[in-house]
A protein has these predicted regions:
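Polynucleotide-recognition surfaces of large bacterial nucleic-acid defense/processing enzymes
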Residues: 1-128, 134-144
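Residue-level signal for threonine
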Residues: 44, 166, 190
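Alpha-helix boundary recognition
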Residues: 102, 188-189
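Glycine-rich, charged/polar anion/phosphate-binding loops
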Residues: 130-132, 157-158
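A short, charged
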Residues: 138-142, 182, 187
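A short beta-sheet element
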Residues: 148-186
């Protein structure tokens, strides 16, 4: 029964009693084509066929970000630190602070550039603790697509990330082919994926 069409409890009860929205003879093996096999009995055959096509994993790689173990020390608002200590471009050895995507409200295409991170200290053994996860150093500063891991009930907004590092609050996708980058971000922000 698909009772989500009922506006209130009484309407849903009538849908149930009138046998409206009942899906008969649904082949449960169809669910195996959907990754993680959620029960989606209302999907048509054409929708189910889409799960057999190319997936986002075929054209992009997803990565989690940095866990500092002590955000009070490592993460600052950009206006809390001396501006000349912030690097806006990739560099090694690491500068005192680099731009940092921590997550936040949903903003399409660009945004959430409020933080800087003491990346140099993250690699210093005297600051190391068991809670630190430094992430994939090769993905630091690379052009990526990011979104907020947590948020309200509104749809996720995918935005451009470049020349910064990301925390776990901003998971990222890296296009395997750089020419696909804008196609991916446009697709993910479309009504098709929401």
């Amino acid at each position: 029964y698909k009772l989500s069409t009922g506006n209130n409890c009484a309407a849903k009860e009538q849908l149930f009693l009138n046998d409206y929205g009942h899906y008969r003879n649904v082949n449960q093996l169809r669910f195996d084509t959907i990754p993680s096999c959620p029960i989606a009995y209302w999907l048509s055959i054409n929708w189910l066929k889409l799960f057999g096509k190319q997936s986002i994993n075929d054209i992009a790689i997803s990565k989690a970000g940095i866990v500092s173990g002590d955000d009070n020390y490592f993460v600052k608002y950009w206006h809390e630190v001396c501006f000349k200590d912030i690097s806006f471009l990739p560099q090694k050895p690491y500068a005192k602070f680099h731009t940092f995507q921590k997550g936040g409200t949903n903003r399409k295409y660009y945004g959430n550039n409020d933080y800087v991170f003491k990346l140099k200290d993250l690699w210093d053994d005297k600051f190391y603790n068991k809670s630190i996860r430094r992430g994939d150093e090769d993905s630091y500063f690379k052009k990526a697509i990011g979104w907020s891991y947590t948020g309200s009930t509104e749809n996720k907004a995918f935005r451009q990330i470049e020349n910064c590092i990301c925390g776990t609050g901003t998971p990222t996708l890296f296009a395997k082919n750089p020419e696909d980058y804008y196609h991916i971000i446009g697709f993910l922000n479309s009504k098709i994926t929401s």
